[in-house]
Amino acid sequence: MAQQGQQGQMASGDSNLNFRMVAEIQNVEGQNLQEQVCPEPIFRFFRENKVEIASAITRPFPFLMGLRDRSFISEQMYEHFQEAFRNLVPVTRVMYCVLSELEKTFGWSHLEALFSRINLMAYPDLNEIYRSFQNVCYEHSPLQMNNVNDLEDRPRLLPYGKQENSNACHEMDDIAVPQEALSSSPRCEPGFSSESCEQLALPKAGGGDAEDAPSLLPGGGVSCKLAIQIDEGESEEMPKLLPYDTEVLESNGMIDAARTYSTAPGEKQGEEEGRNSPRKRNQDKEKYQESPEGRDKETFDLKTPQVTNEGEPEKGLCLLPGEGEEGSDDCSEMCDGEEPQEASSSLARCGSVSCLSAETFDLKTPQVTNEGEPEKELSLLPGEGEEGSDDCSEMCDGEERQEASSSLARRGSVSSELENHPMNEEGESEELASSLLYDNVPGAEQSAYENEKCSCVMCFSEEVPGSPEARTESDQACGTMDTVDIANNSTLGKPKRKRRKKRGHGWSRMRMRRQENSQQNDNSKADGQVVSSEKKANVNLKDLSKIRGRKRGKPGTRFTQSDRAAQKRVRSRASRKHKDETVDFKAPLLPVTCGGVKGILHKKKLQQGILVKCIQTEDGKWFTPTEFEIKGGHARSKNWRLSVRCGGWPLRWLMENGFLPDPPRIRYRKKKRILKSQNNSSVDPCMRNLDECEVCRDGGELFCCDTCSRVFHEDCHIPPVEAERTPWNCIFCRMKESPGSQQCCQESEVLERQMCPEEQLKCEFLLLKVYCCSESSFFAKIPYYYYIREACQGLKEPMWLDKIKKRLNEHGYPQVEGFVQDMRLIFQNHRASYKYKDFGQMGFRLEAEFEKNFKEVFAIQETNGNN
């Protein structure tokens, strides 16, 4: 029995052990599942906004590549999406498919990848969606989102300025903090009370390296999670940047780091090695004497970083927000009654400066390390476009706010204090830099500090992208600026990042530049010049505008109305200076010049055409107007009407005033042959009818027949002129070359003939003869009476000459009958439509001419029954 009881106890022990192991495994799996799966409201919000997210992602890189690198999508799926891009599928459509794939396994890691810093910089439209996710996270599970365990392994998506209440802060006090504490400046959110802020404290940092605790904090800005640890004299910094503009000073796990300043590595070394700066001890005594509460607090010289065991320089703390950052809720607040909390300064748009700090810090004296290297200094300068905070002047422990010794004028120059720098051990003089605070003037330039990257432990080397929300708050925090001794920021060893700025040309800026021109030499200082700390340099905005941009180009000459009139008079007199008023423009021979060449123009020859040689030079040679222009050296102008002059006047002016005829443009194909008649009398065909078309009797660009003297427009001839054919004969000459002896036949036989080339030529000749008649112009186009309903009731198919010409050129008539029927249809419709005598006679004459030519060309035998 005892043995059986012992075996039963062992079995029960094993079962309990197995049960505990299974419970622990299930607990771990539940925690992992809880960490991976998002709450239902956040998942639903993601699913409802997939279209907006896909629209914000405008290009594949870096979003798609980041998902592939984090194994959220497979390599095969990645190649599938790339193939879609190569097939010109819209990016938004492909991104929607990608988000649909992420929806299947949606979790916190997907949100962290989606709203990463790189993606928010590459796709600015994601910023608004990111803030919407923050609001949803805050509304549904604020405590879960701020859990200490969650801060290190998932992004924090609570909205800026909407943190937990003070109860959540009190719950954080009992949480154990690791020895490698992450120190940062505390931040009293609107939801926090000053009492809760006072209860938060960090233990002093011990040995070991600082932990890296990345966190995606909301509100946009720098997550100042610092790992400042003294391990054999070395300090390690692990900053983490966030994808927004506002600098957020927040501790890990909501643990207050107000005692970071009092327990900074520099002070620890000072306690071990003794304070090596007599000036610092004097400053500490002065601070104790000035402030009643200062007796209970340790003063911390932010400008005097101490030396570590290994002699490596410590980086000074940075209170400078990045460009475009807000200083909201991060101003001069003191917690725990022990050490002053760092203050952030911000520049309001109106030019006023919000309260910077609760106490006056001495930032002037950089210490020298054991190796002689200067310490990196603290920068308290605001970036461009930063906004003020509503809570700038609040104190958590009732600390006094000091009055400002320098203030920013609303419309004028800006005063900034310049402090002397001591020499380092190598005797090198450190450069001075002054912070210039600008008024809200269009086109005001930036100071050198706006382009300088923050070099403190919290901001280190990262940059925060600009955001539109960084410029929302403005004049609420306009006030005075505390007295801060500005130290040199040019010894940080980092290159200045130049920033392109829109070149403004407002009239107010230009006017201010002219008004303050007299003060330029007094206010501008050479770079690197040392100025005493008591002297203030007033720098006008006009000087700043001249630092970068100057108006390019030559200054324009301005003329009054009288000056313009005088110029016009001088110009008109100069144009008549070389005119010859004694020339008789009505004479048949006119003296002409082109450059240095002189000649005589014959009007009668010019009337024949522009290709006729009508200008005879002094040496007896004849030239066409174009050749004479080339002879005079004006070949590039290609306008002889302006290049060739008569008495100082161009030939165009003579043609416009009727002194000279405007010659027609005739294109000569080749040299004309002289035909010999039977009586051996020579006739020059070039001298007959060279200025008008045989069909329309109009000038212009004409083509000459190589056999006869007739000329035609390209489209007037039937068929159209073949310019490339050599020799080219008109249809009149071709009809003469056709066999003259034809047997007479009946009209019915002619109409039944097929449209062979010979019959095609005869039909074209008949139509051209009709066009040569003056009455044809009325029947060439569609008559307007076809649009009258009453007139068109008894008509057949509308027909006109151009329509027949088009069909004939396209060889649209298979027989001669079709051509003759269309011609007679024109006259039939005319007789049925027009009842007036004048118009009817016009149609009768043209019809009679056609019938006459038809019988002659086709040799139709007349009968008594047919006309």
UniProtKB/Swiss-Prot annotation:
Gene3D superfamilies: Bromodomain-like (1.20.920.10), SAND domain-like (3.10.390.10), Zinc/RING finger domain, C3HC4 (zinc finger) (3.30.40.10). Residues 754-857 form the Bromo domain. It is found in: Nucleus; Nucleus, PML body; Cytoplasm. Residues 323-341, 384-397 have a biased composition (Acidic residues). Residues 494-512, 567-577 have a biased composition (Basic residues). GO terms for biological process: defense response; regulation of transcription by RNA polymerase II. Signal peptide: none annotated. Residues 22-138 form the HSR domain. Residues 404-416 have a biased composition (Low complexity). High levels in spleen and peripheral blood leukocytes, much lower levels in tonsils, thymus, prostate, ovary, small intestine, and colon. Very low levels in heart, brain, placenta, lung, liver, skeletal muscle, kidney, and pancreas. Not detected in brain, liver and muscle. Residues 268-301 have a biased composition (Basic and acidic residues). The modification Phosphothreonine is found at T726. InterPro entries: Bromodomain, Bromodomain-like_sf, HSR_dom, SAND-like_dom_sf, SAND_dom, Sp110/Sp140/Sp140L-like, Sp140_Bromo, Zinc_finger_PHD-type_CS. This is Nuclear body protein SP140. It comes from Homo sapiens (Human). The gene is SP140.
